[in-house]
């Protein structure tokens, strides 16, 4: 936001003066990807539109470990994952970065959980920034949540100590004593 940008003038100026913006973790590191145009072509080739739930069932047959499928956003896909032998599903819109018009994971969680009951573990990913967010997801039916930004922010700020601190904050926010006022 604007206030954050104003608080970091050196960074803002370097972004404004940058000649070109690129995906530094891919461009120049993957053969044939040198700019955003070739990145788009490379990305499109990474997905096989012919994949079906039968392929997922085949993977489960070949794999003797747990199969956890991330990206479930409908009850139908949840049931399909279950019928393929998935051990757990992760309700996730991948941070909204793939389809920014997709609903938030927390919005679809209750319907998906209701359609599956306790037949499969249901995890939720996306929007978890605090213990309250974890509690909300658990209350709506998630068996577990995943976090990303909270620990990444901690890592960026203080390294390993920051990750430890971020996790401690979330754990402390989940302390039952913190929610005694919610009990009847």
Task: Go through each PLM region and give its residues.
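Alpha-helix-loop-beta-strand connector modules within alpha/beta enzyme cores
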Residues: 54-63, 101-122
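Glycine-enriched alpha-helix->loop->beta-strand junction motifs that scaffold or abut catalytic
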Residues: 63-65, 83-88, 118, 141-144
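Glycine-rich beta-to-alpha transition loops that act as phosphate-gripper elements at the mouths
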Residues: 69-75, 121-134
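Catalytic cores of alpha/beta
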Residues: 76-84, 129-140
């Amino acid at each position: 936001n604007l206030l954050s940008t104003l608080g970091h003038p050196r960074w803002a100026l370097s972004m404004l003066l940058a000649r070109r913006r690129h995906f530094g973790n891919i461009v120049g590191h993957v053969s044939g990807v040198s700019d955003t145009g070739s990145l788009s072509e490379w990305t499109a080739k990474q997905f096989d539109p012919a994949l079906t739930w039968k392929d997922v069932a085949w993977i489960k047959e070949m794999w003797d470990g747990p199969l956890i499928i991330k990206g479930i956003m409908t009850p139908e896909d949840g049931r399909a994952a279950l019928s393929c032998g998935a051990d757990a599903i992760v309700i996730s819109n991948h941070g909204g970065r793939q389809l920014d018009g997709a609903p938030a994971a927390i919005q679809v969680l209750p319907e998906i959980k209701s359609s599956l009951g306790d037949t499969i573990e249901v995890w939720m990913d996306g929007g978890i920034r605090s213990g309250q967010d974890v509690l909300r997801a658990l209350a709506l039916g998630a068996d577990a949540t995943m976090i990303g930004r909270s620990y990444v922010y901690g890592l960026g700020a203080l390294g390993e100590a920051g990750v430890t601190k971020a996790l401690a904050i979330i754990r402390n926010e989940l302390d039952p004593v913190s929610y005694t006022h919610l009990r009847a």
